[in-house]
């Protein structure tokens, strides 16, 4: 399949016969109703929010490369723009302008839908917007929403690995499935602790409950285990067995290039950013640490929430530069034989205390 990935995707999108009707309905000025204005405004703010997320993901990659370069006593990317500030955009243009190639033995439709599913899943995760600015889009069942969406993320990895019809990709997908199932049990136990303490599934209630500091001490004890679980769930070093280069060449995405690889890359780093933000809300107070945003203002809440998210991201990147890759069988033995029995006992004791 020739042509660039971007051109191929645009051709498929524009071939849909009904797209221009929606465009006319949104942009027409005849009989402009309040409902249409609300739809246009919601669409504008949603697109603006996701543009901010994409920009954050782009500069997260640059930040990681700079930290890894500093840990290895080298300069890192600095050729494109001032101090390499335009490097993420150069990488994105390079990837999306390359030829979109489909392996001959693969399933073309599922091969294309795999990265799309991963990117869509990462965007749906941000639908709850858990307090990155202290005034996110909260709702009462936000905690259950995040847990439900997080649990289906592995399907994109399995879809990419299976549709590639490659042994390396399939082994990476099977590893991802086993690892996520194993550590999702631990994730659920740790994730529910803040909600049991507060007595609500609202993320804002969890964030505001830590303002007084009465719950912060209890939840802070859970934080190291949670960070450990986040590293395993997001396939980050030292638990990046899904993309084990020394064993699986590149894991489940070995057959992907151009825009497909870029979409997988964006989805993975978007999930890292989301989990960092979720960590700051559940265990560090997020943007509400100094009180409600109405007292300190939106800007101060934004700075505080972003600072805590940045610190968690920095810790994740620092783990990659500091620790070697763990062994896969030892990782499985660690969770099932050591961590999970201790964690279940502590969780039962925690429920009796509260």
Curated annotation (Swiss-Prot):
Enzyme Commission number(s) of this protein: 7.1.1.2
Pfam family, one: NADHdh
Keyword Transferase: no
Localization of this protein: Mitochondrion inner membrane
Molecular functions (GO terms): NADH dehydrogenase (ubiquinone) activity
GO biological process: aerobic respiration
Keywords recorded for this protein, A-Z: Electron transport, Membrane, Mitochondrion, Mitochondrion inner membrane, NAD, Respiratory chain, Translocase, Transmembrane, Transmembrane helix, Transport, Ubiquinone
Cellular compartments per GO CC: mitochondrial inner membrane
Catalyzed chemical reaction(s): a ubiquinone + NADH + 5 H(+)(in) = a ubiquinol + NAD(+) + 4 H(+)(out)
Topological relation to the membrane, as annotated: Multi-pass membrane protein
TM annotation in the entry: 43-63, 108-128, 139-159, 180-200, 211-231, 264-284, 298-318, 334-354
PROSITE patterns: COMPLEX1_ND1_1, COMPLEX1_ND1_2
Function according to Swiss-Prot or TrEMBL: Core subunit of the mitochondrial membrane respiratory chain NADH dehydrogenase (Complex I) that is believed to belong to the minimal assembly required for catalysis. Complex I functions in the transfer of electrons from NADH to the respiratory chain. The immediate electron acceptor for the enzyme is believed to be ubiquinone.
HAMAP family according to UniProt: NDH1_NuoH
Family per record: Belongs to the complex I subunit 1 family.
Protein name: NADH-ubiquinone oxidoreductase chain 1
Organism: Pecten maximus (King scallop)
